[in-house]
Amino acid sequence: MAFPLQKTFLCSNGQSFPCSNGRSTSTLLASDLKFQRLNKPFILRVGSMQIRNSPKEHPRVSSAAVLPPVPRSIHDIPNGDHILGFGANLAEDHPGYHDEEYKRRRSCIADLAKKHKIGEPIPEINYTTEEAHVWAEVLTKLSELYPSHACKEYLESFPLFNFSPNKIPQLEELSQILQHYTGWKIRPVAGLLHPRQFLNGLAFKTFHSTQYIRHTSNPMYTPEPDICHEILGHMPMLVHPEFADLAQVIGLASLGASDKEIWHLTKLYWYTVEFGTIEENKEVKAFGAGILSSFGELQHMKSSKPTFQKLDPFAQLPKMSYKDGFQNMYFLCQSFSDTTEKLRSYARTIHSGN
């Protein structure tokens, strides 16, 4: 994942059953959202409105300006020009803030991501023994909860990766697995991308992923996405065709969206891909990466403390919270196909101008 903060059964021969609408995720086209505007380059202006950053929970609207050009391919999306935080520059409350060696390590890994060119193999990271121990502890602890807490699609996909506590997977290997099943690719990133760039990447079936790992002082906690979150939270779900469609629909909706719409789409991503839950046989199971990559969040989700609501993409969504402890509320999906259709309906209002 690259900004703040989450089947059909996969056959043994490497093929996947089609989505419920009869199409594999590779045939999900931009035309589904009426993207005639993608046929030629252009710059969008939304009336005379501009959205400007604000310290408040949502952006502030002010007078005329031009939105960024709409990317026509993943090549048009910068990789690292707008890193919002973390990366090698850590906040004072970060576990690794006072560890100069850790910060230098993060900086080196971030530099590799910044230099990466699309089409080239993702740089391999030679993880240290300490980093490998962190990965092993996280994988071992989370694997204890997955059978009872994770959705069935996650459990079906998980074995495809052959995760081992003895080795941190490399992004290039994982990217090849995603390509094989759903046509998605991974692109390394130095830290938290601007939401517009991150969401735009999803439209082109590209997932921006960090490569650094959380600080060794607290293996079960990270204030930002790291390689453990990316691998254990996101990768198993992205080989599931219907979930991959869901993520891509959010990305397609972001192409040419105003800053205000980007903010709403960011929340939709947050409450589905990051912290989404789904009902299975009258039980709540996790499919969001922010839950699946957190031992404490998984336990909290199954406790009596949080509340659950149905997702309405058109409604005003609660403030995103990732530093105030666990989520107080989760959105509960009935199915991935149903949620995707709801998101697609919302996306049509963005691109029809309504």
UniProtKB/Swiss-Prot annotation:
What stretches pass through the bilayer? none
Which SUPFAM superfamilies does the record associate with it? Aromatic aminoacid monoxygenases, catalytic and oligomerization domains
Answer yes or no on keyword Kinase. no
Presequence boundaries: 1-60
Q: Which UniProt keywords apply?
A: Allosteric enzyme, Chloroplast, Iron, Metal-binding, Monooxygenase, Oxidoreductase, Phenylalanine catabolism, Plastid, Transit peptide
Q: Which residues bind Fe cation?
A: H229, H234, E274
Q: What is its EC number?
A: 1.14.16.1
GO-annotated biological processes: L-phenylalanine catabolic process
Assembly and oligomerization: Forms monomers.
- What protein does this entry describe? Phenylalanine 4-monooxygenase, chloroplastic
